[in-house]
Amino acid sequence: MSKQKKFILQENEIPTQWYNIQADMVNKPLPLLNPKTKQPVTVEDLAQIFNFECSKQELDTQHAWIDIPEPVREMYTYYRATPLVRAYALEKALDTPAHIYFKNESVNPLGSHKINSALAQCYYCKQEGTTNVTTETGAGQWGAALSYAAKVFGLEAAVYQVKISMQQKPYRSSIMRTFGATVEGSPSMSTRAGKDIITRDPHLSLIHI
């Protein structure tokens, strides 16, 4: 038998808390600034576009450990723990004594780590009484993750995807729609910002999707 390459936790070993590194940093990052007031962003500022609990966690610099809600952790068990893989071939190619590992996130339903955050965000939105979520996405991974999470927690989802990316990766938007999301190429005429952009540069509305 060759050396062990994959290391996988059992379901009952999946962490029960998220780690907030800011709490342990001696030199903490500069605060986010409100673009209107130029003052440090408050939880109330962020809560205008994100749910309150995630806004609070985003600005928390005191608590190192945050409990993972049990419904979120339960959803994690469907695809976590993802394998931790020892990259022996890369170590050999680099001729290094260091041990190199990578996390294989391709085994989860959406193929990226973004579902981990999307599930938590949609859970908190549901708990706070939100009925629908709206997001942007570039290549489509985040849009797919949020669409899936919204479906899990009974929310409606609207996704605005960069129009050229939507054209180049048509199956990503198909995945989002499979989970019940509405998907629109951006810029579009359905938003004020999109109308302004297309008015200034009309050819942007001609990209086929």
Predicted regions and their residues:
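PLP-dependent amino-acid enzyme catalytic core
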Residues: 1-207
